[in-house]
Amino acid sequence: MKTYLKFLSRNKLYTAIEFVGLSVALAFVIISFCYVVQQYAVTRENPDRERIYAVGENKNMINCYGMKEVFDGKLPEVEAVSHFQFVQDQLIHVGEQNFVGTLLVCDVEFFDMFSVTLKEGAPGMLSECNAAFISEKLAKKLNEASAEQPLIIQDDTLHIVGVIADKGSSLLPDFDVMMNYEHAQSYAIQSYRDNPFNHWANIGTFIKVRPDVDREELGEKLQALCDVQFSNSPTMEELSMVRFDELFFASAYTGLQKGDRSMLRTMIVIGLLLLVSALLNYINLNVALVGKRAKEMASRRLVGAQKSDIVWKFLGEAFVFTLFSFVVGLAIAYALTPTVNQLLQSDVAISIPFSLPYLVAYLLIVIVVSLLAGILPAAIIAKAQPIDVVRGTFRFRNRTVLSKVFIVVQNVIAIVLIALVLTMELQMHHMEDRPTGLNVENLYFLGSDLDYTDEKEAFVEELRALPCVKELASAQSIPGVMSMRFGLKKLHETEPKTYVPILNCDTVAFRMFGFEVKERFGDTDAHSFWITETTVAGMTGLPYGDNNFDTIKMWENHTIGNTVCGVIADFKMQDALHVTDEDYVLVYGNGGWNPDSHLLIEVAGDHREAKRAIDAVYKKHCEKVFGIYMEPEFDDFVDNVIAKQYDKHRRQMRLIELIMAVSVILSLLGLVAMSTHFASEREKTIAIRKVFGGTMQSEIRRNLKEYIIMILSANVIAIPVAVWLCKRYLEDFAYRIDLHPWIFVVTVALSFVIAIGSVLWQIVSVARVNPVMALKKE
């Protein structure tokens, strides 16, 4: 080991490049490994995961309150049925303390479906009248005086009977209070109980079945029960079932924590690509430097060492080097984890644990990486015969195309990532600049819990008095943002209904948005609605202008009294992420002021000053009503609200950009190291060529040509891969850019600039060497 350390100290540049590259790559491998393990751990948190199913309609796992009644006690295969819902942004009063948190309303059977650990109390205590469990996090916030006081949420006064332990990675979202449906007194819950099958809400229904129940047969029996219950109702169509261990990555809406399978695959690929790039640097440099250790290994062979001894020595050195790199990589990963979590915004945050199972896994990673890193250099040096080293012929034999192949592979990775990042940036700007087809300039959208209080009138009047407010209207949604959707039956087809977004606003907001009226059928009233040109064609099967109708079936077998008052020009109601074959929209824009709707404010002057003024008024009235500041659901200018929809994609793009930068740096370091090695190896050759008439310029061109050929080869391989990958990326967007050739022209140009810039200085320095001084060294 002493000779190895001495060798590293004599080759500081190569050592630094290998160590930095491998440490950074291993940091991302560690992050990716923890991300993958912790995501999949969520799917396995319940030991009965293969016996529990979420049920819903058309892959939408939310139901009406009465869905539990449909299944409970009806089938011998079903052991338990539970229903529950999460209600966010609830004002919680405990004594003199106020909190804003999430309420979980459920039944006792909830404990059969989810792994919930109680620090205090027992599951059966939830059946007690007005009982509540609180989270460990909330319990820590309560002072001694509040701990014995009742807990008040809306119309419910509860007494605390237990504490739920804080969980790590889990399918359940964080919640602060758990209470029983049977004892809830709020208006919404009472309306569910009074009309259990009329209110479709964000309620999950889970069933637990006996072991070895056939899934298909169970689904048929559950569907039959639903057909009987909803035979005269249009609200229930095809039943869907998702097993517990499938929920986390399911495409269906569940109301629970969600995993991103696409990002999971991306993180795996990212970790592997960076590891491959760093390993190529390590292997390439060690193979190139084998000649510098040839005499040492020849001497060992001459004094009795076997080939296997040499191989094990190299593998041992690789293990030590990888172990130190891993320790540094672990520190880098620990430091980077908050940044990566912020970029990913995953429901299950990444952590870097140091428990025994993880330490064993880390050790296995070190062993595998060290084997991959050390086996090739070990095999090459072990094949060398001592006599070849003594004669000086070994260094000529070890020059193969391997180093060039590694450089090409490294640059292929970097080039593909550069093209992908350019495409992602262009697509992001394309979405942000997408016109909605309506006026959204200087419009501010404010939606909060004040919308449902008696304080709203005073709040609105104070807003009207602000100098920055020109006009104020009510609107339940805005264009360019996904909104409430209704089922709409096509008049010319027998197929299932189409789900159509609704924009509901008053006449003032209708004018603010600047809808273009194509045709008015008659007088408007609060119960009539506008329909877009595309919706006319889609619903009737005839182009706009070839039909005449005044009613639309909102539900199969049911005709509502609302009438079509006219046709408006098409506009963008959905965001750019959702792929749809049809772009239907209904607009209720004829009603008067709706006190339960959100606020649409037209402002004048500086946007930042206007936002500060509006926020100050909101905070004042919010604290007056609730005693605490409650974050509004919407609180920004309409164009900013639209742009915020793409925050997730923007953050993921920043992560890919970070990976791209690391990959390019690794590639650059590899080129610098190899150009330095090749320059020192070719110093004598260049000197001889200059003696026989070569010039500095000719030697620069000759040596640079070799790197240009390598980068050109990398581009030939990388560009088709990049084109395919970029096309796949863009397929996820309904509103997307064309994949222009200039993107790849810029990518190729950048790859050449990076490559030439990283090797040119070494080529120039060796080409300027005095031939006399170079030949003296020989």
Language-model regions, residue ranges each:
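C-terminal transmembrane helical bundles of large multi-pass transporters
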Residues: 627-711, 715, 728-729
